[in-house]
Amino acid sequence: YMTVNTLVKEKEMWDLYSYLKPYYEAGLDAVLVQDMGALTYIRKHFPDLPVHISTQMTVTGKYSARDLKSLGAVRVVPARELSLKEIREIYDDTGLEVETFVHGALCYCYSGQCLFSSLIGGRSGNRGRCAQTCRLPFDAEQNGKYVNKKNEKYILSLKDLCTLDLIPDILEAGVCSLKIEGRMKSPRYTAGVVSIYRKYVDLYLKEGRAGYHVDQADRDALLALFDRGGQSQGYYRAHNGRDMVVLKEKPEYRDVNQELFDYLDRTYVNVEKKIPVTGSAYIAVGKPGYCSVSDAAGN
């Protein structure tokens, strides 16, 4: 999969073909887009390349999803502000593949509509350069009086999303792919979070709701991997809520779960990547040598 989920300027559109062509020829499975112009351009020049719609396109309902399907999209990542009911409606109405965020950072502003980073830092979140301005401390005044000072609470910083308890609901809403936010995260974080969610998806598929239970050790592991001041279930069950915002000082020191980190490094990060292969060689005097190697999948 390739991410092209950024706004593409007019003068850049013509470079999109040469940018995608080598990846397309190498077997690219799908491309993720935000820009409507990029969507139509890719459908024209790479008609058999599946196109996924990024959350940055702010798909907030079934009507926009219908239009995107008519333009050739096969999968949509809805806006992160949608409820489970609204996500289910998109799937039921369009039959599109639906992919939703299940873990990681949440934006204070609407997905794909935020200008905060551009205005304050000169870096556009819609061009892949978000400075995460909402993570900074801010003063807040009401009727001329401070209700928050910079050194007190992070009033615009949202807690990270965590949906382990909602996996059955999410899968039953027609979601086919779980999206884990990993911007500027380490391989250790990626390995830890993905392996935990894989565990609970498999548990639900095997045992159903009756056998579904989340271990506290896994909740603790997710917080140990990254903690911005707690976790929430985002907008899946609540339209909005005070408990989604950090609203507290960052702790000066966090205990490190070194045992967990060592396990992840040993199991996923610092391992040699190998797969079994079979092969044959043909060598004859006066002729070019020939060697053929393949893996179990026939590659």
Name each model feature, range by range:
Residues 8, 57-60, 82, 185:
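Glycine-/small-residue-rich active-site loops that bind phosphorylated ligands and cofactors
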Residues 6, 34-38, 57-59:
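Short glycine-enriched loops at secondary-structure junctions
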Residues 8-12, 40-41:
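Short active-site-adjacent helix-start/loop capping segments
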Residues 1-5, 9:
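Short intrinsically disordered, low-complexity coil segments enriched in acidic
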Residues 1-2, 14-24, 33, 37, ...:
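Surface-exposed amphipathic alpha-helical tracts and adjacent flexible/coil segments at the periphery
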